[in-house]
Every structure is written in C-alpha cells, then in structure tokens.
Amino acid sequence: MSKPANNLQDIFLNGARKNRIPVIVYLTNGFQIRGIVKGFDNFTVILECDGKQMMVYKHALSTITPSKAILFNTPAGTDDRS
C-alpha cells in the first residue's frame, strides 16, 4: 500500500513545527493565539504559548500567520508529524 502525498496544510504546519517558527493563529471568533506549533493531526493543532501547551481544534481556526516564510520544497514522502 502506498503512502498518500503530503498536502499543503501538512507541509505548512510541519515546516512551522520543525523550524520552531512563531505563528499567530486567528480563530473564527476573532481571538488570536501566539505560539509555536508543537504537533498536529487531522483534527487538532498543539501550540506552545508562554510555556503552556494548548490544543486547538482545526474547525475553530481561521488563519495561521507565520513570523517568517515557510518553504514548500519538502522532499516527497517525508511526513514527520511527531
């Protein structure tokens, strides 16, 4: 069985996580969360904010803005979410 290709969402979040790029997460209710992506799955994103961990459900996310550009030239087949 072949492994599915990475989608842009996974590449973006994995790039932010691996490079410890600070992000601003905008929720659908307008609230902003500033932190570092620690992990993610199909339904949630784990952020570290002020030394604390926060789990945010993806259905509540509006926008994620990184503090610097995230490169999308990840080699195929490198899905490392942990």
From Swiss-Prot:
- Give me the disulphide-bonded residues: none
GO annotation terms (biological process): regulation of DNA-templated transcription; regulation of RNA stability; regulation of translation, ncRNA-mediated
The record's keywords, sorted A to Z, are: RNA-binding, Stress response
Molecular function in Gene Ontology: RNA binding
Q: Which InterPro entries match?
A: Hfq, LSM_dom_sf, Sm
The Sm domain is annotated at: 10-70
Q: Name one GO cellular component term.
A: cytosol
Q: Which Pfam families does this chain map to?
A: Hfq (PF17209)
- Report the protein's function: RNA chaperone that binds small regulatory RNA (sRNAs) and mRNAs to facilitate mRNA translational regulation in response to envelope stress, environmental stress and changes in metabolite concentrations. Also binds with high specificity to tRNAs.
Query: Which family does this protein fall into?
Result: Belongs to the Hfq family.
Q: Could you tell me which PANTHER family the record lists for this protein?
A: RNA-BINDING PROTEIN HFQ
What do we know about how this protein assembles, alone or with others?
A: Homohexamer.
Stated name of the protein: RNA-binding protein Hfq
